[in-house]
Amino acid sequence: MITERDFWNHRSHNYDEQIGPQYERAYQLTAERTLAYLKPEDRVLDFACGTGIVTLEEAPHVKYIRAIDISDEMAAKAKQKMIDHGVTNVEVTQTDLFDPCLEPDSFDVVTAFNVLCYVENSDAVLARIKSLLKPGGRFLSATDCLGEKLTKVGVKKWFKSHTGSMPYVAFYKMKELERRIADAGFTVLERENLFPAPPNLFVAAQKK
């Protein structure tokens, strides 16, 4: 089976170019919903930042962003994007969520866009996110819920994940994902489906 890092390194080569008008709109909606929960003094952890599409939108609205991705090539593209746009308050690092350099209670906001459906140990990931947030910190996520209804995208990802050509994929239903976030110690503040097929659930939550 292909590793997560190798898979996302490969996807990085034309990731931005493959986002069609529909997905581009979903990213725009994600950014719009996110900005409503950001404050000028916030320190943000952008978990699985990818090529930095949403990171770039967040940057002018907060004090500092630590953007991380398991893929060194995704991280490199995000870093270059920040340089190209003159962004100086974003630090991009190739690492994972469990890097001990990320200290508990050190972030006002953690964002996780289009990544929760690709993590196999979701309980551990959500617990780690909670630990990294300051008391009352906000967790903002957008996740494909491939189990909500049958779609071509879902079938394709199921086949690829079961034949080893892409890593693990979770098939959440929207209510199931919302419940998992709540059970991890968060109060759900807002939920909205941003995309028809597959459903892409935006959840704004606060650490209890």
Residue ranges and their predicted role:
Residues L45, T51-D99:
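Class I SAM-dependent methyltransferase SAM/SAH-binding core
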Residues T111:
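A conserved beta-strand element that flanks and buttresses the S-adenosyl-L-methionine
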Residues M1-K39, L140-H162, F195:
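Conserved class I S-adenosyl-L-methionine
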Residues F159-K175:
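Acceptor-substrate binding/catalytic loop of class I
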Residues N114-V115:
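Short catalytic micro-motifs in class I SAM-dependent methyltransferases
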Residues A184-F186, E190-K208:
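Core SAM-dependent methyltransferase catalytic element
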Residues D123-P135:
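A short glycine-rich, Lys/Arg-flanked "PGG" loop and its adjoining helix->strand segment in the class I
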